[in-house]
C-alpha cells in the first residue's frame, strides 16, 4: 500500500449478524468446544496432535458412512434404488476423503511416532467399533471381531445386531430374487452372522444383468455402485496398510495384531465376489 492509498474497507457489512448473545452460533450448532476438547494428548510431543486429529476425522467420516450405509440398505429393501444410489455415491466420496487423510498422517516419520507410541498402551484402530460396524454392514462378518468390545455392553449389542442382520450385499441379492432371478434360498435365507460365500447362481444372475444392461438398467447401476464402493474401500485399506508400514514397518500393532500382515489380509477378501467374477465371464 502506497502513502496515498487507503486501507481496504472491512468485509463485514451492515447485514452481517454480529449481535449473537443468546442466539444460535456456528460454534453452538457444531458444539465446537466439546469437539475440540476431545483432543487430549498424553504427551507434549508435536506429532501426537496430528495422530489424534487424523483418527478423530476418520471416526467422524465412519459415523457418516454408517449412516449412509444404513439408509442404502433400508432403501434397497423397499425397492427404492435411486436414493440408495445417492447414499452409495456419497460413501465413495467419503472414502476418497478418508484415503487423503492417510496422506496427511504419512508426514509423520517413524521417529516422530516413537516419541509417543508407548503411551498408547493397548489402544488400537482394531478396536474402532464404527469401523467394525461399517465392515459388518458391508458384509465382512466375523464374530470374533466382537471380542474386543465385550467390555462395553451398548457397543457390543450394536455390533451384534449388525453381525446378525442382512448386510448391503444380502439385501441386493434379495432384490435380485424379488425381480425373478434364480437366487437360491441358501443365499438369501442363511445365517447372516457369517460372510457370504461366492455362488455360481449369483454370478450367473449378475451375468444376465450385465449382458442385458438396458433391460435391467437399475440393477446394472446397482452392481456398478457396489463395485465402486468396494473399489474405494479396498483403496482405503491399502493406503492404511502402506501408511502403517511406512511408519512402523513390520512391528506388531499396539492392539496385539501382526500389524501390516493383519491389515494386508483384509485385501484378500471381497465384499461382493460375484461382481468381480462377472468381469472374467463377460
Give short role names for the model-derived ranges.
Residues 2-282:
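Surface-exposed peri-terminal alpha-helical interaction modules
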